Amino acid sequence: MELFELTLHELHDKLAKREVSSVEATRALLARIEATDSRVNAYITVTPDEALAAAEAADRRIAAGGLTPLTGVPVALKDIFVTRGIRTTCGSKILGNFIPPYDGTVVAKLREAGAVIVGKLNQDEFAMGSSGESSAFGATKNPWNLACIPGGSSSGSAAAIAARSATATLGTDTGGSIRQPASHCGCVGLRPTYGRVSRYGVIAYASSLDQVGPVTRDVTDCALMLGAVAGHDPLDSTSIDLPVPDYAAALTGQVKGLRLGLPKEYYLEGLDPDVKRALDAAIETYRGLGAEFVEVSLPHTDYAVATYYLIATAEASSNLARYDGVRFGHRAAGAANLIDMFRRSRAEGFGAEVKRRIMIGTYALSSGYYDAYYLKAQKVRTLIMQDFMKAFEQVDALLTPVAPTPAFKIGEKVDDPLQMYLSDIFTIPVNLAGTCAISVPAGMSAAGLPIGLQLIGRPFGEETILRAAHAFEQATEWHRHTAQL
Amino acid sequence: MNYQAVIGLEVHVQLKTDTKIFCGCSTTFGASPNSQTCPVCLGMPGVLPVLNKKVVEFAIRAGLATNCRIAPRSVFARKNYFYPDLPKGYQISQYELPICQNGHLDIEVDGQVKRIGITRIHMEEDAGKLVHADVPGLGSGSGVDLNRACTPLLEIVSEPDIRSADEAVAYLRKLHQIVVYLGICDGNMEEGSFRCDANVSVMPVGSTTFGTRTETKNVNSFRFVKQAIEHEIERQIELIEEGGKVVQETRLFDPNTGETRSMRGKEEAHDYRYFPDPDLVPLVISNDWVEDTRLSLPELPDARRSRYRSELGLSDYDAEVLTATREMAEYFENCLAAGAPAKGAANWVMGEVTRALNEAGKDIAECPVAPARLTALLQLIEKGTISGKIAKTVFDEMWQSDKAPEAIVEEKGLVQVSDTGAIEKIIDEIMAANMGQVEEFRGGKEKVFGFFVGQVMRASKGKANPAVVNELLMKKLKG
Ligand SMILES: [Zn+2]
């Protein structure tokens, strides 16, 4: 087995036994990136020099007995994470030349743990998109079929795992941006509860919905990554001051007596047959493991997509105002005056999807429309949260599809934004409710594309969904399938 | 037709916290450009604000001192607009749910007490500033200095209860005095620590419908506020009399001409697209916090003034002067605490102490004569050890040196002479030397009395007790 094929915990074991050094693992990963990324385009920036220096430091640390689960492990980060001294673009031309002067909290935690950052991953511009096509650095391809999208917006985070060009990655999930690409690429992707992981140093798309989470090869890796980045941060007022559980210890394999809810609004008539088949099989697997199923209702599900696109775009229109060409990033040449400079810098720097969402958000917040759109959306959001809280009175977690279909063809939905927005229909309600959910591989389509299933947990119920996902993983072989590149 | 002005004021108070409202950067004024910045106040991608608790504490103080209700739950909002010195493209402020509401201040104009309502007080961050032309290293461009960005401000908004420029100034002076008293603002108007926007409209006397208002921005002295409002009232009346219409707009005051001029019209008015800032959780303030703060408030000028009148028996004027600043009042009260008589201390603080401070260009906080020393001096006068006149000499010496008044009196032999025998001897000598004047006095020219007093005092080098001198002199002259 090649070094780049190892999971995080397998590599950790080898590092612990000194069978391999971090420098060897890092070199293997860098070579794998070199060999695959011209086809996959999972990376925007690769940082071999910094990575090898970090790997050497990790080896010294391991020799000194300072090994933690992430020490010496090559990881890659969505280019939404601010990295000191390393170009951070957020997939946008407007930040194409931006080199941040600071590390965000999650990055600092990874560095402290001794992880080796090998590069920054491709993504939809400012995390706006469901297909990985709206990056200023070109579309990311699905390693299972290079003609297909990998999902988005954390397209590079999932594609790099599927291409085995990163051992573990971090993404962000605002409306499904971790779970949906993880599902399309056959990875494990976790969106933690809002407030579980610090957002300090994560370039904001929609502040009240964004959350950092891991994309990994299996559930154990996912638990280890979450444990490394979770926790209260005094630099993020919205982060919650709760102790971080030992997530890996929660993976007991036991789901006997676990009550899983099937929200009837998620099992639509028109669900893709491959997705439906995978879910039915998953339900049978869980039954075999002793889990119980209860039908539940989330009555406001129909309004989730519309609500999401009002709240997310409203916040985005404000969060993206700082990209005005004044202090950093792209500035248009030859502007006639100040307003012209703002206008042209933004017109040149932002892509079509970002502009579309800024326009929607600006409209939703403007006087005369605020009550009808933004405020109404906030009220519906509260109803959606209440739906979940009611469901969690009956069950420990919900089992649902991740995406309505397997990955579609690149270019297929580019001209139909509304159709594209519906691809997040099963993931978005989780973000509105602020709770946690995981996507795990649960099948393959007839066309040979991965299909994931989603387990939605109650707020701060990460241990439960990790345990359930892990038990499923142990009972099935889906996570062992590998994309051929 | 007669017109009535309607005025509302929005006052921006820069808070005297050590660090900024949403980051740990220093708020010191006058540092080199952009030296007091970090990723947060620079609005870098990925940063998040964290609220400075001290700012909340100061806002509660201001609210309590102006009789406001402190909201148990308040919310920060984003005010969205584009400007080069606004790093995030929005300003974090409070909007729908501010920290303080429904307060009031009583002002006094021409002996009449009037209550001015305070609509709200909210917390917000300041923007940076633009530096135009000749920026070091930039040549003739424009530079952005973000040292001031994220500096904490309170915006105190009055009801449109003010009816004249004089009332406006009285209200502002009072507010200024309070925030300085509270220790939450340095009150430095030239540096912009206390600045005001004036909303002015006029309507016919007796009308209940307000006219169209204009807003004059950033006036930073009491005199300019008076000028700006008076000019604006006059301008609006003239405009209406000529058949014109006042347009709602933002205006600037030009201190050189004493006039206001249009800055931007309503057609350019912003839609700020306020919405609750998702990066800051709602601010919850416990009742205990409010009550603890209430207990920690200093006695405010109004209460102090009335106490000086009723308990110390001081005149309105004295009470007013002594409470003008918290430092002045504290100096005075430290004298009382050391055992000084109220009236004597009042006279000396308002007289010699103030004169000496003015001459030295010093603040009372820097007064070299400590209250206890001044009190010791006053006690020497009371006991008759020295005369009031000699005391001034002693005071000047105390100002220069670090000596106690007793030591100075002893060293220079300034002890007052009250011994009647010694004084009688001097009087006899002077009368003998000035028989002509004695005759004049006895002939009814009583003015000459003063001449004799002066001569005796001079002969005693000022040490003779004036009361004794007067008494003996009168007796002897009358024969
Ligand atoms: Zn700062």
From Swiss-Prot, chain A:
The family this protein is said to belong to: Belongs to the amidase family. GatA subfamily.
NCBIfam families (UniProt xref): gatA
Entry's EC annotation: 6.3.5.7
Single Gene Ontology BP annotation: translation
Taxonomic classification: Bacteria, Pseudomonadati, Thermodesulfobacteriota, Desulfuromonadia, Geobacterales
Annotated Gene Ontology cellular component terms: glutamyl-tRNA(Gln) amidotransferase complex
Gene: gatA
Summary of the function given for this chain in its UniProt record: Allows the formation of correctly charged Gln-tRNA(Gln) through the transamidation of misacylated Glu-tRNA(Gln) in organisms which lack glutaminyl-tRNA synthetase. The reaction takes place in the presence of glutamine and ATP through an activated gamma-phospho-Glu-tRNA(Gln).
Organism superkingdom: Bacteria
Pfam families listed in its UniProt record: Amidase
Protein name: Glutamyl-tRNA(Gln) amidotransferase subunit A
Subunit (UniProt): Heterotrimer of A, B and C subunits.
Catalytic residues, chain numbering: 78, 153, 177
Reaction catalyzed: L-glutamyl-tRNA(Gln) + L-glutamine + ATP + H2O = L-glutaminyl-tRNA(Gln) + L-glutamate + ADP + phosphate + H(+)
GO molecular function, one term: ATP binding
Keywords: ATP-binding, Ligase, Nucleotide-binding, Protein biosynthesis
Keyword Protein biosynthesis: yes
Matches recorded under Gene3D superfamilies: Amidase signature (AS) domain
Species name: Geobacter sulfurreducens (strain ATCC 51573 / DSM 12127 / PCA)
Curated annotation (Swiss-Prot), chain B:
Keyword Nucleotide-binding attached: yes
EC numbers on record: 6.3.5.-
UniProt keyword annotation of Nucleotide-binding present: yes
Subunit structure of this chain's protein: Heterotrimer of A, B and C subunits.
Protein name in UniProt: Aspartyl/glutamyl-tRNA(Asn/Gln) amidotransferase subunit B
Origin species: Geobacter sulfurreducens (strain ATCC 51573 / DSM 12127 / PCA)
Single GO MF annotation: glutaminyl-tRNA synthase (glutamine-hydrolyzing) activity
Gene name of the record: gatB
Cross-referenced PROSITE patterns: GATB
InterPro entries the record matches: Asn/Gln-tRNA_amidoTrfase_suB/E, Asn/Gln-tRNA_Trfase_suB/E_cat, Asn/Gln_amidotransferase, Asn/Gln_tRNA_amidoTrase-B-like, GatB, GatB_C_1, GatB_Yqey_C_2, Gln-tRNA_amidoTrfase_suB_CS
Upper taxonomic lineage: Bacteria, Pseudomonadati, Thermodesulfobacteriota, Desulfuromonadia, Geobacterales
Similarity comment text for this entry: Belongs to the GatB/GatE family. GatB subfamily.
Superkingdom field: Bacteria
Function: Allows the formation of correctly charged Asn-tRNA(Asn) or Gln-tRNA(Gln) through the transamidation of misacylated Asp-tRNA(Asn) or Glu-tRNA(Gln) in organisms which lack either or both of asparaginyl-tRNA or glutaminyl-tRNA synthetases. The reaction takes place in the presence of glutamine and ATP through an activated phospho-Asp-tRNA(Asn) or phospho-Glu-tRNA(Gln).
Reaction catalysis annotation: L-glutamyl-tRNA(Gln) + L-glutamine + ATP + H2O = L-glutaminyl-tRNA(Gln) + L-glutamate + ADP + phosphate + H(+); L-aspartyl-tRNA(Asn) + L-glutamine + ATP + H2O = L-asparaginyl-tRNA(Asn) + L-glutamate + ADP + phosphate + 2 H(+)
GO biological process, one term: translation
HAMAP family: GatB
A Pfam family hit: GatB_Yqey
Keywords in alphabetical order: ATP-binding, Ligase, Nucleotide-binding, Protein biosynthesis
EC primary class: ligase
